[in-house]
C-alpha cells in the first residue's frame, strides 16, 4: 500500500540527521518531494482543485516543478552535475537518475496509478536503508548494492510498465486524457491543470486562441487532419474498415481542436487512444517526447537524462524487455489488430534547443549502443507482427505555438492556409516534375552561397513508363501540408556530401551539419555544435543515427511548396519550422528506412494510376533473406533550403 511506503518516507524526513552521512540532504529533499506527492494525492481525491481559481492552480502547478525550472536546476539533485559533485561519478549519476524517476510521481498521482507510485517509493526507502547502514559502519555508500536495487526494481516491474504503455496505445478504456478533452468546459481554462503537466503562458494562450475561432474554422481544421488520416489508408491500399482505434498525439492547449477531431474520427468508426509522453526511463526514447505533453520544465534536464537506462542496460535486461513486450502484445492482440496507427499534431515556434552534453550524465558505452540497436530491431519486428505495417497508416500536421512571437496569430492563419492548399493544382505541377524524374538515371543536388552540398542520387529504372513510376506524388494525406515528390533511391552509386547551415532534428539544433555518403550509406559526419570533435560526432550518432554506426538514405525528395517557403521567409521563421513543413521547401534526404517500411509488398499508385515501384532499396530487400538486417526503425529528414542551392539536375537515362 502506498500509505505504508509514505510512512517510510516520513521516517526518513523526521530522522534528524537522516543517518545517511553526506547523503542526508539528498534524502531530505527527495523525501520532502514525496510527501508533497502525498498531499497532491489527497488534494485530488478530496477535489480541492474544483473551486480553486486559475491563479491558484497555476501557483500549485509551479510548486510541483519549482526545483527543476530555471536557475533552480543548477542546485537540484535532478541535475547530474550537482549529484556527481556531491557524491562522486557512480553514486551521483545513480541518485540523480532515481530522483528523475521519482519526479514521475506527479503523473502517477494525477492518473491514480498508486501501485506504480508505491513501488517507486519503496525503491527510494531501500536506497536510504543501504546508505544508512553504510553510514552506521563509517563506510562509503555501497554502489554495488545501490545499483542492484535500481536494476532489480526496473527489471521486476518491467512487465507492468511495458504492458501498461502498450495498453495506453491500443486500449480506448484508458481514457484519462480523453475525459479531460471531452468532459471539460474548455472555456474555463482551469481544465489545463487537470493533466499534471507543467503549464505556462504558452499553453494558456494556445487554448485562448483556439477558443477565439469559430466553430466552422475548428471543424475545417479538424477535417484537414482526419481526412488526411483517412486518405492515407485509401492511397496506401490499406483496410481502414478493419480499424477501431486511432492514437492521437498533441500538445496541451489544443483541446478544442482535438475534441472535434475525436468526433470526426468516431464518425469513421475510430475511438481515440491518447497517452502521455513517458515519464519512466524504461519507456522513454531518449529526450524525444512521444504522446501528449505540456511545457518542458527544463529541456536541459530532459537531455541530461536521455540515457538513464545506461545504469541497467545489459543483455539480460534487453531479453527481459523483449519478452515483456511480446507477452503484452500477445495478451492484448485483439486490440492491437484493430489499431490504425498515430495521428500526430506537432507544434513549432520555440527557440531551438542547443544542449550542453555534460560528462556527468549517463552515456551508453559501445556494448550498450549495440544492445539498443538490437532491441529496436527486434521490438520493431514484434510490434509489426501485431500491428501490421501493411494494415496501419498515420497522418501528421503542425501548427505554431504562441512562442513564435508577436505575430503568432498571423503565422497561425498562414499555416492553416498552407495546410489546406489546392490539392488538384499541386497534383498537376508535381506530376510534371515526376514525368521528368522518371527518365533520370540519377539526380544531382548542388549547393551555393557557402553550402557545400554536392549529392548524386541514383534513381531506380522504370521498365514500363505507361504503368510504372518511381516518384510518389505526395499530397495532403499522411504528411500535411502537401508539396513533395519522393522516391527510395538506389543505394549503389548514391554519393557525395550533404551540408546545411542550421537544421532542427529530433529536438536538437545542429549547426553547419555535414554528412558524407558512399553507395547510399553515411561514411562520415560533423557539426559545429561543440569545439570538441568527438562531442559533435556523438551528438549526431545519438540523435540522428540512433546509435547505428551508419544509416542508408531511405528517401530522396524534392519539396514543391513555394507558398510555405515564401511565408517562412516573410515571418523569418525558417529555422523555427518543424521538418514536416521544411521538407516541403527544398530537396531533402531521409536517413534510415524507406517511406514504405514494412509495407513494401502493398502495391500503391499515384493519382495518374501508375504503380510506384520504388518501394524497396537494397537494404529493405533483405527482409526476404535476412529480416534482422532489413530495417533500422528510424527515419530522419534533412532539408536544404532553396536559397542554398545552385541547381537540381536530372541527367536522362540513355536508352540501351
Language-model features: where?
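Short solvent-exposed loop/turn micro-motifs enriched in small/polar/acidic residues
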Residues: 438, 506-509, 549, 582
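Short, glycine-/Ser/Thr-/acidic-enriched flexible segments
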Residues: 253, 350-352, 401, 450-452, ...
Amino acid at each position: 500500500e502506498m500509505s505504508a511506503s509514505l510512512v517510510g518516507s516520513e521516517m526518513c524526513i523526521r530522522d534528524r540527521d537522516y543517518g545517511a552521512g553526506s547523503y542526508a540532504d539528498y534524502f531530505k529533499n527527495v523525501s520532502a518531494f514525496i510527501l508533497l506527492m502525498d498531499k497532491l494525492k489527497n488534494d485530488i481525491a478530496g477535489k480541492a482543485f474544483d473551486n480553486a481559481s486559475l491563479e491558484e492552480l497555476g501557483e500549485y502547478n509551479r510548486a510541483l516543478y519549482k526545483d527543476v525550472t530555471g536557475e533552480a536546476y543548477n542546485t537540484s539533485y535532478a541535475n547530474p552535475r550537482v549529484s556527481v559533485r556531491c557524491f562522486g561519478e557512480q553514486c551521483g549519476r545513480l541518485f540523480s537518475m532515481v530522483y528523475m524517476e521519482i519526479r514521475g510521481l506527479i503523473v502517477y498521482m494525477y492518473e491514480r496509478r498508486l501501485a506504480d507510485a508505491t513501488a517507486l517509493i519503496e525503491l527510494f526507502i531501500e536506497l536510504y536503508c543501504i546508505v544508512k547502514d553504510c553510514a552506521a559502519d563509517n563506510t562509503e555508500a555501497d554502489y554495488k548494492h545501490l545499483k542492484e536495487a535500481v536494476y532489480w526494481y526496473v527489471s521486476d516491474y518491467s512487465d507492468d510498465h511495458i504492458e501498461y504503455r502498450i495498453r495506453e496505445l491500443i486500449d480506448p478504456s484508458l481514457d484519462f486524457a480523453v475525459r479531460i478533452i471531452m468532459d471539460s468546459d474548455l472555456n474555463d481554462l482551469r481544465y489545463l491543470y487537470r493533466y499534471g503537466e507543467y503549464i505556462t503562458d504558452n499553453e494558456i494562450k494556445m487554448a485562448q486562441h483556439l477558443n477565439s475561432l469559430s466553430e466552422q474554422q475548428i471543424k475545417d481544421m479538424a477535417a484537414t487532419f482526419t481526412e488526411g488520416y483517412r486518405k492515407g489508408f485509401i492511397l496506401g491500399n490499406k483496410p481502414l474498415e478493419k480499424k477501431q482505434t486511432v492514437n492521437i498525439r498533441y500538445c496541451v492547449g489544443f483541446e478544442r481542436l482535438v475534441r472535434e477531431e475525436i468526433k470526426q474520427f468516431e464518425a469513421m468508426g475510430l475511438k481515440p487512444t491518447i497517452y502521455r509522453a513517458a515519464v519512466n526511463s524504461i519507456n522513454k526514447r531518449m529526450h524525444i517526447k512521444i504522446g501528449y505533453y505540456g511545457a518542458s520544465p527544463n529541456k536541459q534536464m530532459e537531455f541530461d537524462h536521455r540515457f538513464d537506462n545506461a545504469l541497467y542496460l545489459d543483455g539480460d535486461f534487453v531479453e527481459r524487455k523483449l519478452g515483456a513486450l511480446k507477452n503484452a502484445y500477445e495478451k492484448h492482440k485483439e486490440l492491437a489488430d484493430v489499431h490504425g496507427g498515430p495521428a500526430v499534431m506537432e507544434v513549432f515556434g520555440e527557440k531551438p534547443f542547443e544542449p550542453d552534453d555534460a560528462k556527468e550524465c549517463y552515456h551508453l558505452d559501445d556494448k550498450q549502443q549495440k544492445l539498443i540497436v538490437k532491441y529496436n530491431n527486434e521490438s520493431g519486428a514484434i510490434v509489426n507482427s501485431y500491428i501490421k505495417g501493411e494494415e496501419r497508416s498515420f497522418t501528421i500536421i503542425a501548427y505554431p505555438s504562441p512562442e513564435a512571437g508577436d505575430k503568432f496569430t498571423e503565422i497561425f492563419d498562414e499555416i492553416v492556409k498552407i495546410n489546406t492548399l489546392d490539392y488538384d493544382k499541386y497534383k498537376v505541377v508535381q506530376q510534371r516534375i515526376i514525368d521528368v524524374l522518371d527518365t533520370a538515371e540519377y539526380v544531382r543536388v548542388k549547393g551555393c552561397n557557402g553550402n557545400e552540398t554536392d549529392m548524386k542520387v541514383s534513381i531506380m529504372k522504370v521498365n514500363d513508363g505507361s504503368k510504372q513510376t518511381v516518384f510518389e506524388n505526395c499530397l495532403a494525406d499522411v504528411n500535411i501540408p502537401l508539396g513533395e515528390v519522393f522516391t527510395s533511391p538506389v543505394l549503389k552509386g548514391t554519393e557525395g556530401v550533404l551540408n546545411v547551415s542550421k537544421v532542427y532534428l529530433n529536438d536538437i539544433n545542429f549547426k553547419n551539419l555535414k554528412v558524407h555518403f558512399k553507395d547510399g550509406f553515411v561514411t562520415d559526419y560533423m557539426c559545429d555544435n561543440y569545439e570538441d570533435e568527438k562531442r559533435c560526432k556523438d551528438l549526431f550518432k545519438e540523435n540522428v543515427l540512433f546509435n547505428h554506426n551508419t544509416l542508408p538514405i531511405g528517401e530522396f525528395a524534392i519539396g514543391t511548396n513555394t507558398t510555405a517557403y515564401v511565408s517562412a521567409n516573410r515571418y523569418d521563421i525558417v529555422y523555427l519550422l518543424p521538418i514536416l513543413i521544411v521538407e516541403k521547401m527544398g530537396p531533402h534526404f531521409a536517413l534510415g528506412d524507406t517511406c514504405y517500411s514494412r509495407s513494401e509488398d502493398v502495391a500503391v499508385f499515384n493519382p495518374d494510376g501508375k504503380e510506384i515501384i520504388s518501394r524497396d532499396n537494397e537494404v529493405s530487400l533483405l527482409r526476404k533473406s535476412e529480416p534482422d538486417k532489413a530495417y533500422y526503425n528510424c527515419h530522419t529528414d534533412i532539408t536544404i533550403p532553396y536559397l542554398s542551392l545552385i541547381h537540381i539536375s536530372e541527367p536522362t537515362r540513355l536508352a540501351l
